[in-house]
Curated annotation (Swiss-Prot):
The lineage of its organism: Eukaryota, Metazoa, Ecdysozoa, Arthropoda, Crustacea. It is found in: Secreted. This is Anti-lipopolysaccharide factor. Gene3D superfamilies: 3.30.160.320. It comes from Scylla serrata (Mud crab). Its main location: secreted. Residues 1-26 form the signal peptide. It comes from the Eukaryota. GO terms for cellular component: extracellular region.
Amino acid sequence: MRTRVMAGLCVALVVMCLYMPQPCEAQYEALVASILGKLSGLWHSDTVDFMGHTCHIRRKPKFRKFKLYHEGKFWCPGWTHLEGNSRTKSRSGSTREATKDFVHKALQNKLITKNSADAWLKG
């Protein structure tokens, strides 16, 4: 429900900007395109090759206590049921921390060796 509230507030802000009288001519199309470009960049999904397995990465925004966080998820459906999860203030940090969480869990479950885990944990 919080995501819907934030989306509603963003839409209301754009509508308000469009209908408020402006002292000069504004380029509304450029403004809306810029806002939508920034908002759509918050979500990200990708497929990666991880130690010979096809894995997925997903990042999505989340608001908690009026602060923007990025939740990351890393999983390999054809290999294991484990998932790496994270919540950070950094977009790139969320995917990196989710990958590290997955590597830690895979190491604990003896799916990978310590040497191969160290290569991913240092990077």
